[in-house]
Amino acid sequence: MTTRSGETRHRTVASLRVLLTGGRAPVTLDLARMLHRAGHRVYVAESALRHLTRSSSAVEQCAVVPSPRHNTRAYLAELERLAQDWQIDLLIPMCEEVFYVAQGADRLRVYCRVLVTTLEQLHELHHKYEFIQLARSLGLSVPDTHLIQSRQEWMEAQSVIEKVGDWVWKPVYSRFAAKVRMPTLMNDEARAGTDQEGNVSEKKRRHFRNDPPDEVALSSISPWVAQAYIPGQMLCTYSIAHEGQLVAHATYDSRYRTGSVGASVFFEQVEHEDALAWVRQFAQATGFSGQIGFDFIEGQDRRVYAIECNPRATSGIHLFHPGDDLVRALTEPETLVKEGKMITPARGSKAMLMLPMLGSGLQQILGKRKLRAWIAAWRGARDVVYVGQDIQPVFEQFGVVLAAWRLARSQKCSLTEALTHDIEWNGEQQ
């Protein structure tokens, strides 16, 4: 049975104390508000000094913790202390720190329930080659994908595979399409790898030089993949699973992004039975529990091909507003399994991140893209950050961006990389 978000008013479990990690992310802010609205007490642990949720009225307390990536042992020790001091009932990792939480999950479960699967399973899903191999072994549709572990392998593979099609090159450990190399279109007005609607294009490509990264960026420790380029529509999913059973699911269009293939800034619910069937089969076959997202291409043959997996919270959360039913999927998934229910967003749900969405609008003007469609999307979407009764995060986001910009300058990295540098996980301790 499918239940639309907002259609039911079931009594939730008694008020819980919920600890969220990853307070910098808009999904964490949105979920904190949903939990608060449902009567739960929300606490946040975050390694960044400036983050969206720290000033939210939905949050009881925030704690600044050590970097999960750079000081994992101290980070986990602090989470243990907070779980005890705040008498936490449920810990929900929201961003890439989920991998570090998984390392200490057994210790943390002494004090509270932890919504995370094993580190071994998380790694298999996060690794862009191992995930493809797993999905293929389950009989699910995925693109042809090759593992590249050296400059020599890169050159050898490139000389063979690029004679039979176009390819996307990307690190196996990456996020928000960072460092992705897309095929380049001949039409300079079109974005590399996408058409004027934001879909993957089948236009002819021009030859371009695709030199391999240096030995530091490409090795057996930091491999890349070459993945067959499939023209079609991009789709994303967000799901919550409990012991292999889906208790919440959303498929959404994310046609507006930061750059041509970067992080999504606009989210619109779509009905897509094939994407749902793919995710359901994967969850059942792997017995997965927790939050999980997938990126798909719907090819011209109408089949969906999974290109990546994100075993954590993704922006599909925003489509479940106001979120009472989604909260049930997180706090009492076993009840939904017994009831045979799966929560989905209301039909036509839309959400956006207003500031980067404005930047996307500028791209429409400069790139001669369909500004009218962008305006319609803007007018029909809820801003994730702005809530009249919780206004402070609107102002906080400017401080977050400024802090990230300063870090990006000092570290000589992109703004996106600066936003995740201290929580990202690249296969450490495997």
Q: Residue locations for each model-derived region?
A:
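Peripheral (often C-terminal) accessory segments that flank ATP-dependent C-N-forming ligase machineries
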Residues: 200, 328-430
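ATP-grasp fold ATP-binding core
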Residues: 135, 143, 159-180, 194, ...
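ATP-binding N-terminal substructure of ATP-dependent carboxylate-amine bond-forming enzymes
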Residues: 1-117, 152
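Conserved metal-phosphate-binding beta-hairpin within the catalytic cores
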Residues: 284-319
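Phosphate-binding site of ATP-dependent enzymes
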Residues: 184-257, 261, 268-274, 298-305
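Glycine-/Pro-rich loop/turn segments that contact NAD(P) or position catalytic residues
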Residues: 121-141
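Glycine-rich phosphate/pyrophosphate-binding beta-alpha loops
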Residues: 177, 256-259, 310-323
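Oxyanion-binding "anion nests"
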Residues: 262-265, 270-294
